[in-house]
Every structure is written in C-alpha cells, then in structure tokens.
Amino acid sequence: VGSEMCIRDSHYPRRPRRPQQPKEAATPIHIYPLGGLGEVGKNMTVYECCGDMIIVDCGLVFPDNDMFGVDMVIPDFTFVVQNKDKIRGLLITHGHEDHIGSIPYLLQKLDLPIYGTRLTCGLIRNKLEEFGLAGKTKFVEITPRQKLKLGCFTVEPIHVNHSIPDAVAFAIDSPAGTIIQTGDFKIDYTPLACGPTDLATLSEYGQKGVLALLSDSTNAERPGFTATEQKVADGVRSLFARAQNKRIIIATFASNIYRVQQIIDLAVEDGRKVAFSGRSMVNNTAMAQELGYMHIPEGTLISIDEINQYPPEQVVLVTTGSQGEPLSALSRMASCSHRQVRVGPGDFIIISAKPIPGNEKSVTKIVNGLLLLGAEVIYEGMYDVHVSGHACQEEQKLMLTLTRPKYFLPVHGEYKQLKKHAITAASLGIPTSNILIAENGSNIILSQDEMKLGEPVTAGAVMVDGLGVGDVGNVVLRDRKHLSEDGLVIIVATVDSKTGKVLAGPDLVSRGFVYVRENESLMDGAQSIVETALDRCVDEHVRDWNSVKTRVREALSSYIYRRTKRSPMILPILMEV
C-alpha cells in the first residue's frame, strides 16, 4: 500500500484553532519513517531540517512464522549510514524491544550519542554489554521538561504513561515548526508510579501551535479508554487469595517493571518469598533495583536454586515466557526441561500478558503443556491479569484535541490501525488533506504551507539469524520454506571429467522427505532415473556441469512427484575425477 493522502471526504466542521506561531515558512522538515508503519514493531523515524538529522527510536520486530530460523528483524540502516555526518543523536522514547532492540546493530555501523531517561538508558546499557558496546557508547540521561539542543532541533521530552516506567513523548521544535511524536502512550489517571501523562505540557504546545502529530495507533480499533494498571493489582490480588495452598508462578514481560513490583508487593502481603527465572527477568529487575525503580523488602528475594527449600504456599516465582518464546523459562517448565522447577498439581500459574499477534499458537502450546502437568493456569481473558499499555480511541482523541496539530500522521500499527486512527482524527475536524497514512521509506515534507511526498528512501526488513545480519534474504527464506514442506534429496555421483561417464554412484540421501528403509522401491526407482539422466547427457555430449545438474534435477523431480505428489528440494553433487 502506498502512502495515502486525503483518506476520505470530510463533512465534519473545522474547529476554530489558534494560528500557528510564525516560523520560517520556507523552511521544510523531512520525516523519514524507517520502521513502525504497517507493522507493530521495528519503530524508527528520522527527522531532517537545515542539514541536521535526529533519529527517534531504533527497535526490532520478532519474525513471522514463515521466517524459518530468523531470530529477529531490524530496520534497514542504509539511509542513516549514507547520512551519518548529519545525525546529531538517537533519542529513545522508552525501553521496550520494539523501540531499542536494534540499537546494537546500528552502533556497529555508526557512533551516536543516545538520549533517554534513566531507566531507558539502563535497559539499553544492559543490551549493549552483550555486544561489548556499552563502554564505547555515550549516554545522555534526560528528564521530562528538560530541553535538548541538537543542531537546529530543540527537543523536549514529555512524560507519558505506558507499561514501563520513564516513557516519554518528544516535542521536536525546528525552524519549520513543532512536531510531537507520542511514542507508546496511554492516559492513566491512577498510575502505579511516575504520575499521569503530562496533559498540561501537551496542551501548552497545542496553544502555541503544533505543525504535526505522530501518534501511537496500536489500539485505534478499540473504543473507550484503556484500563488502569490498578485493575491488574486488584485482579492478581484475588488470584493470590485463591492460591492459598499452592505455589504461584507468574509470567510477564521482563521489562514491565510496574507489573513485577505489583507482584512483589502482593507476595509480601501474602507472606511469600519471591524468586526470578529467566535471564532478562533477572537482569532487568537487578538493574531496576539499582536505579531505584523497584523496591524489594529485605528477606523477600531468594535465588531460584532455593525455591524447593520452602513450602509451595510460601513461594512466588516470577518468570519470562509470557509470549510463548521457545527457550523462555516458562516454556522450559512446560516441557519439563527447567533445571530448578518441576511443575505439578500444586502449582497455580498466571500468564499476566496478552499474546502479541502471531504468538497465540506458541502461548497456547505452553498453556496446554502446563495443564497436562496438572497445574492450574490463568491467562488473559479469564481474569483481570493484564491491561494494555496503549491508548484506546478516547485517549487518542484527547491527544489530538490537546495538541491541535495542523497535520496528522498515524504511526505504530498495522495498516488497518493506521487507517482507523486517521478516521478518528478526521472525526475531530482535521481536514483529510492534512492526514497522511505513510509507509516505511516515505519522504514526508512538511512546511507551514503544505504537506507533500518527496522521493522515497531505502527502507525495509533486515533479518538477523545468529551472528548473520542481512545475509538471509527472500531466496534463503524460500529455500527454508521449501525444505520445511517437502524435505531434501541429495544426489552424489563421481563422474569422469573428460567423458562425463559415471564412475561411482549415484547415491541418494534423503532428509525430511521419506524414511529410506521403508521406501526402498521409491529410492531404487529414483536411482535408476538419475542413472538414465546421466547416461543421456553422455550420449548427447552435454559437458556443461550446470546443464547436467539441471537435467538430473528435472528428471528426478518429475519422477518423485508422480510417485508421491511431493516436491522435495533436489541437490545434485557431481564430483569430477
């Protein structure tokens, strides 16, 4: 889907609004979204004005089910590398993976200062230590309302509520005007900590004049308001009461410091010890305690190795694995491969998270495994064990009403969510000609006079597989998909380099296709087909080895399909002597 302007005819009355404060009207600002549009994750946006650039966020997205063997997907950094001399800094809205997960890969190409709140910098620093980059990177800790000067940009962080502490929006001022990028946000009037979203500052910018708003679209299809985190505390407290004589195991996001603190507080109320399982959970909670974002009373925290020394009713285990990750602690518990934890009928398990789209099957598999072991399992939809960290429609309307932008760009969502958010904006009187549903790689040019699209820039998905970054492309994925569906047949033969005659073999090896011992007639027939194809090449004086391999592959493929209605990958290996 290309970038879309004028989403539909608008019959809504235009609201009276204060005029934009005069700026240098001839000066445009360019916005280049490199990720986060048409997808949930991989958020990355570049702003350019007067020869200066800043980057907001640098996240990853986890692979689709058909991306076999791929660990994660990151943005294509070609454009920022080409413009590295213009970049004044990397600003981060908050510490979730879809906003910070690609930073190590970017820093392997560029040396950039990172601007983030205290907790956000702590989470990034932990991540960079795994790559040996933490000591080489300049961190600048920021606080809400503290303005930053980066080239021609003046940036003010604005406190917002989210499912992680220290989340901010950014008001980005330039000679072209002021742009507000919300990051992930919701409006929670009774948050657990840090206070409500700073509506006053957002309103101040709306009064001064906002050129454009880039706003979180994740929950654009959900009416009403997002529930408060206090609701989760009440729901989990009632479940603690139900599990009086059982060990409690709770899976949640390791980055959800609020949720983990809630669990600790409830455990203390119930007289239970707390243990953590999962590397990211252990690392994040240790870092949160060190920075003062988490408080665990003395004597409450125990090692995972100590949990079996206490009666089950005196233990709460907080673990990773709420998204069904195959190697997570909860997954290992479900498969009986966790070193310290054996799940059984005495366990009460709460999955305090909603599956990210695409993870539903993985989560269901873990739930089934835990139930088969005799545990009682509670998950999202059964009780109030999770609330979203993203704004629903009424909060999105409030953000639009407070900031009163001239132009609106919905971001952070799949196309259907961006579209719905655009319709919501139009319902508030923003002219549809001033609303743009863009795509990754768009070159959005804004000024006081107009919004237009320039020449697109390089943007896309770079796949990370182990230590390989970008070496897995569509051809490799197609081969992996082929292998996963019908398997592989390898043909090995030794041939005379001068005559082409077969000196040894051909031998056939099957992997993921058929079990050879139970299909000897099929494999004998396949061997005969290969011998015939090689003999014909000799008779017809075919000496080009690529042509010989193609003939062998086509002959064998046709035979196998006739016999099995399957099409395995066929790999001929001819050794010349």
Report the location of each language-model feature:
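Conserved hydrophobic residues forming the short capping helix/wall of the S-adenosyl-L-methionine
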Residues: 128, 425, 560
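C-terminal tails and terminal domains of large nucleic-acid-associated
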Residues: 541-577
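Hard-cation-handling environments
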Residues: 222-352, 356-525, 529-541, 549, ...
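A glycine- and charged-residue-rich anion-binding loop/surface
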Residues: 37, 61-71, 86-87, 379-382, ...
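Short, small-residue-biased leader/transition segments that mark boundaries at the very start
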Residues: 2-7
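Broad gene-expression machinery/nucleic-acid interaction feature
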Residues: 152, 167-169, 314, 486-490, ...
